[in-house]
């Protein structure tokens, strides 16, 4: 298949808000692929290379020919082979050899192909929250039910591998995907609750009520003496958190997978600001800042997979091996006990509580009602769509944020409001320095961004409004913090915003 067909499909998918049309366009290209083309094409249409990040930046791409080709000629095989070759180059003179291979490739690309390829190679290709749409398209193209495709993806964390299995082996190949210790699974997610009473009542009181910490999500895998730690986006951070590795290696088990949070504490035991915890995950780790783990789930223990077991059984497994590192929680409290636990969580400096169904399995990668988060104020994780230049004291700074909610059908985020409230001088400076790196377009007043950055917004409520495309507007929105641990695909949906409407 010609690479130009992939570029055209990407353009068509990005041009529509209709989930049905997106799935149809992706299916149409998938059914035309040769077996060897499935893995790279699914990766590209998901905004990544099947080889992973290969260390290519704008400096390496500085020698590409100035004039694009007139006629499409590059095939999927050509491109994938070149990327594989570039990824394998190392040693003396490697930079020059990489540039030569890429220059030869770009000399054969058209203008549209070149734009797509530049963004793909530099990690700058924004495909939106396409994972769910691509999963549906794979199922449609392979003529399979959607659910086994979704489950295989959640367990593998890799859409290209899931697609290959679907086309090569059907349902049998997909059901062969299992939880593999050492390979992260996509985390189960919670939905916001209107109140503690609503969550407790909806789940029938057969619940675990746990502290909701202001920490960073972690997934820890242990196999013998081998321990790996991953973030909520499945990025490995093992080398940055030796204290967590040492702690889990010392637990009384031979193999385990734990889900939880980690955070830094003050000398008095209260949580430090979220940004301080996240600083440990960077390349320049602040090693003097000790992280503490708080686990709330056990997905595997000593050879037994527990994903499909009810939460009550998973909590019992966690209690057997890590009782001192469990997140504070109550099993089947009455309504008064749940309320007291909520108050205790807030008094300890935490965000609120999670209310979880004790009967629910672990729905990897899914956001449902089996887990509900309760906070004292409404908060939403929204996508930053742009920022306006400030005036007065904020002249010269990017200030007023344009905020969008995720489209559950995989379209572009839907704008629901603006705010500059809550922005400190430090955040204003950071935005002004950082936002141009994500710039999509600009005019005299506003810098428009690719949907990369997620910000946590506190608000008093939501009202119906014709001012924004979603028909909703945030009331008294203010910035709490940025969420570098979250992608746009994990932002709250327009449905979650709509659920906050009164009545």
Swiss-Prot record:
ATP binds at residues 210, 217, 232, 261, 296, 367, 373. InterPro entries: ATP-dep_DNA_ligase, DNA_ligae_ATP-dep_bac/arc, DNA_ligase_ATP-dep, DNA_ligase_ATP-dep_C, DNA_ligase_ATP-dep_cent, DNA_ligase_ATP-dep_CS, DNA_ligase_ATP-dep_N, DNA_ligase_N_sf. GO terms for molecular function: ATP binding; DNA binding; DNA ligase (ATP) activity; metal ion binding. The keyword Nucleotide-binding applies. Its EC number is 6.5.1.1. Keywords: ATP-binding, Cell cycle, Cell division, DNA damage, DNA recombination, DNA repair, DNA replication, Ligase, Magnesium, Metal-binding, Nucleotide-binding. It catalyses: ATP + (deoxyribonucleotide)n-3'-hydroxyl + 5'-phospho-(deoxyribonucleotide)m = (deoxyribonucleotide)n+m + AMP + diphosphate. GO terms for biological process: cell division; DNA biosynthetic process; DNA recombination; DNA repair; DNA replication. It holds the Pfam family DNA_ligase_A_C. The active site is at residue 212. Its cofactor is Mg(2+). HAMAP family: DNA_ligase (MF_00407). Belongs to the ATP-dependent DNA ligase family. DNA ligase that seals nicks in double-stranded DNA during DNA replication, DNA recombination and DNA repair. This is Probable DNA ligase. The gene is lig.
